[in-house]
Design a protein with these regions (language model features):
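Hydrophobic alpha-helical segments at protein termini of multi-pass membrane proteins
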Residues: 1-239
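A positional/structural detector of protein chain ends, strongest at the extreme C-terminus
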Residues: 246-247
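Solvent-exposed, extramembrane regions of membrane proteins
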Residues: 241-243
């Protein structure tokens, strides 16, 4: 099937991929820089990564909400995508025009990795505040979204490698025949995964806001304090009182 791809679709698709790559490059820098001495810029960059993750997931989850809304009205129809999602999928699908569903798989894979990077940002920024609730919820989100991300990676690779349909948990590993049963199962599987993940992310960000002073305090450079004299050194400089009986 020939699909006309506009310049806007191509630019949007390239921009989305660059967005994800930039976020993961930042995550790598943060993970390395946060291991040693305190670097205040790590805090600011982590906030930026989290913010981009929030924006990305806000758009991503809306696509799934729209799909479910369409399914409610047309439960026997093939999964629907918004015009924006369709355009981005068409742009991404140019990497392999002979695989019509690959663009859609890459789109959701990219969206999920943007989401995952935002959650990793929460874990990184709280590395010096281990007892915070934000860190607990952030780690929970990374675990769940990590599994979800692997699912999308498997779905994408299966299509890219020539499978007749995507293979993964959300397709019963390719055992479900294309039709209303498969479409319904996959639509709701990914909708619930994204909604639950988004709620966890929202709770993590909420606690991060409430605990922001505690988290930020870990990135303040300590002012060096004068060292207390060693006991032996102090004894050497202590004057010995004169013996009153000595002449």
């Amino acid at each position: 099937m020939n699909v006309t791809v506009s310049m806007l679709d191509s630019v949007g698709a390239a921009g989305l991929v660059l967005w994800a790559v930039a976020m993961w490059a930042a995550v790598g820098v943060l993970a390395y820089a946060n291991r040693g001495r305190v670097r205040p810029w790590v805090y600011q960059l982590s906030v930026g990564v989290i913010g981009l993750g929030v924006v990305g997931q806000f758009g991503h989850v809306q696509e799934h909400v729209a799909q479910v809304a369409y399914w409610i009205a047309h439960p026997n129809d093939k999964a629907w995508m918004t015009p924006l999602g369709t355009g981005l999928a068409n742009g991404l699908g140019q990497v392999a025009p002979d695989k019509p569903s690959l663009g859609m798989e890459i789109l959701h894979l990219t969206g999920n990795f943007i989401f995952l990077a935002g959650l990793v940002g929460v874990v990184l920024i709280t590395r010096r505040a281990l007892s915070t609730k934000a860190r607990k919820w952030g780690r929970m989100g990374v675990l769940m979204q990590g599994i979800h991300g692997v699912e999308h990676l498997v779905l994408t690779l299966s299509v890219a490698l020539g499978a007749s349909q995507a293979i993964g948990l959300s397709t019963w590993f390719g055992l479900l025949e294309p039709g209303p049963g498969l479409w319904t199962y996959r639509i709701w599987w990914h909708f619930l995964a994204n909604v639950v993940g988004s709620v966890i992310f929202a709770i993590a960000v909420y606690h991060l806001w409430c605990e922001r002073r505690q988290v930020a305090a870990g990135y303040h450079r300590d002012v060096p304090r004068p060292r207390a004299p060693e006991p032996a050194a102090a004894a050497e400089h202590t004057p010995v009182p004169a013996d009153p009986g000595a002449r």
